[in-house]
Amino acid sequence: MKALRHYNSTMKNQFERFNGLERLYGKGSLQRLSACHVAVIGIGGAGSWLVEALARSGIGQMTLFDADDICVSNTNRQLHALDGTFGQNKVDVMKARCLAISPEMQVNAMATFVTPSNMAMLMEQGFDLVIDACDSFRVKVELIAWCRRNKQKILVVGAAGGRTDPTLIRIRDLAKTEQDALLALIR
C-alpha cells in the first residue's frame, strides 16, 4: 500500500511538471516517456543540450557517459559550462541539472568514455534508445555496429561544424548524410 501511495505521489508530481506533454502528445504519453531509459554517450556540444531536452521531456531514466571535465573553452557551445562548473565532470553536473528539472528521474552518471573494449559491458543495460553524441570516429563506428548486431535503437548525432542555420538540421538515415564530414566518413 505504501509503495502504491509513493507511485501515485510520484506520478502526480511528474504530471504537474510535465502535463504539457500530455496535451501535446496525447493521453498516456507521459507514462510512456517516464518508462523510457535513454543512454547518452558524449555530454559535450550536442550531448549536453540533448540531455536537458530529454530531462524536460519527462524521460524516466538516463545513463550519461563522458569522462571529460568542463573547461572554460566549452562556454560557447556546451550547456553545462558556467561559472562554478569549470573543472567538474560533465556527467556529474548534468545529473544535478536533470534532477533539478525532474527530481523523480533516475540519472546514472558514468564518468567513463565508451570505448570498443568496454562497449559491450556498458551497453548491456537494456536501453530503449542509445544516443551517440561523441566525437570519436572509431567509437561511433563500433557503437553503430554493436547496436545493429544487438538490435538496439540508436540515434547518431553529427557536429554543427560552424553551421549557423538550425532549420537545415535533418533526421535521416546515416547513408544519406550530407554536410557532415565525420558522419560522411562513417557511412
Regions found by a protein language model. Give the residues of each.
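Short amphipathic alpha-helix with an adjacent loop that forms part of the alpha/beta core around
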Residues: 117-126
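Conserved S-adenosyl-L-methionine
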Residues: 56-61
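Hydrophobic/small residue at the entry helix of a nucleotide-binding pocket
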Residues: 46
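E1/E1-like adenylate-forming module used to activate ubiquitin-like modifiers
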Residues: 129-187
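Conserved SAM-binding strand-loop segment of SAM-dependent methyltransferases
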Residues: 106-112
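Conserved N-terminal Rossmann-fold NAD(P)-binding element of oxidoreductases
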Residues: 40-42, 65
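Glycine-rich phosphate-binding loop and adjoining beta1-alpha1-beta2 segment
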Residues: 64-102
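N-terminal charged helix/coil linker that caps or initiates catalytic domains
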Residues: 2-38
